[in-house]
């Protein structure tokens, strides 16, 4: 049983006074060990980082998202959508409307994405885990509409967590030509109040641009009646996401696109995969060089032990 270890020990370390061979052999072995360790650690870090980023998006993005392939908005009506809505795997169905707008607080302005959502948005995502502040997640009441801003947008506008003055929101009127004599007449203006909370996704894409508000506010601001930009879905526990995605895509046809969480953030995860591959490539190259050093060391050891 110990014979292989005895032979390895005998021929790895020389009793002769050939210190150079000993040093080169030790360096080669250490080089392979360190390169292998670095490769394993780096890939583990990238995998963990990918899971962490996916966790951030999981709290904000839905499990499945239905959008139109061409155009910006659509009406989720008709037999096909009724069939999708009646699928037993569907747990939460939420209609959303996203559009660009300009927001102003006192003398500060910024471009933002207004995302109007239905009241069951809290059931769709884990938005509560992203909220900071003494208030609560509320989109509207019988009097006013509320806007939940990203933490970086709060900083840019200087509103603070609980802003007293309303946030002014401007959006160009649809199908209306700009009135050069009175440009302000070409824009819709509405107001959002603070619910006392902000969301922190730790992703600039959301934290620096998004404002969550009610679907009715977004439709009124952008002159839409029943149109939406997406239908967001949460599946019941135990449902197969891939199988349901394919089923919905088959029902709706080629006119619509159904995306899971990874496909919704395809650019982010694609960049992470590229970084992971490049790191793997470099470390594999270093490991290959270390292996050539081992081969050279073995060649010198063979010459050293040839008399044995």
Sequence positions of predicted segments:
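Peri-transmembrane interface segments
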Residues: 16-26, 237, 241-295, 301-304
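A short beta-strand structural signal in non-transmembrane regions
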Residues: 64-69, 227-246
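N-terminal Sec/SRP start-transfer signal
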Residues: 1-37
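Single-pass alpha-helical transmembrane signal-anchor segments
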Residues: 29-42, 284-287, 291
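Short amphipathic alpha-helices in soluble, non-transmembrane regions
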Residues: 78-85, 128, 244-252
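A structural signal for hydrophobic secondary-structure junctions
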Residues: 86-209, 216-222
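Membrane-embedded alpha-helices of multi-pass transport/permease systems
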Residues: 38, 43-46, 50, 291-302, ...
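Membrane-interface junction motifs in transport/secretion proteins
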Residues: 46, 50-80
